[in-house]
Amino acid sequence: MYAGLVFAGGGNRCYWQGGFYETVAPRLDLKPKRVVGASAGALAMLYTALGLGHYVRERVCEACLGRSSEMDWAGFRQGGRLFPVGDMYHLMLTDLFTRERLATLQAQADFRVAISRPPRFWPLPVAALLGIGAYQLEKRLRKPVHATAGRRLGFKPDLIRLENCAAPDDLIAALMASASVPPFMPAGLVGQRAALDGGLVDNAPAWALADMEAAGEPTLVLLTRPVSAVPQIANRTYVSPSQVIPVSQFTIRNPEGIRFAYELGIRDGEAFLRSLEAKARAV
């Protein structure tokens, strides 16, 4: 039914996408040709395609147990990262993406991971600070579905195609870069060039499906925040959570919020299916 899918970024809110996709995909027999994801949405698009949603959620929720802080001061004093979420994310990616699973994904669809390239000759710490600051400010003031501040600053969009990943390490580097939000997540390096969170250019990179839409092929964009209005673009459908998801993007101590996001995705997926059935009956 949909030839292209977009998984927007959103950190832990992206577990909503897992619940929605797992509910809707079997009923609609979704077999998209191209799937694009940014930040944690890029991970969500891949583990849902592999049918590993339950495993990922349980592993993450288990890792949250017993944690009272987002920071690891003891590890930091010994030379580790202050925010352990980045190392935890990398460890999970290394466990998930074997050579066999990469081959499975490459044979299934044209998956693309969105990253942002900072302006050339900018020191990376400056680029990260300005890019993330501009993104957050625009989000708070304008609440756009598609951000524009990053492009105006000179950030460039880039896509890493899974078919060009020769080994799991290439995919893991792309996923880490797509979620790169210092100091929470480390800066990325892809193709010997610096890379930051794909959401700094556009958190919902539907631009990567524009050629399909222009050719008359329908696409579906999975957002991770409730929105009151979306752009009206031919052949594009947006879906979003029906309420605010009570979990912060990078938290590693809120398993209840992660489960809530997933369960809300299931409910919203069922509501979406009912709306499609109602439209079909009205025709």
How should each PLM-predicted stretch be described?
Residues 1-38, 46-283:
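Patatin-like phospholipase
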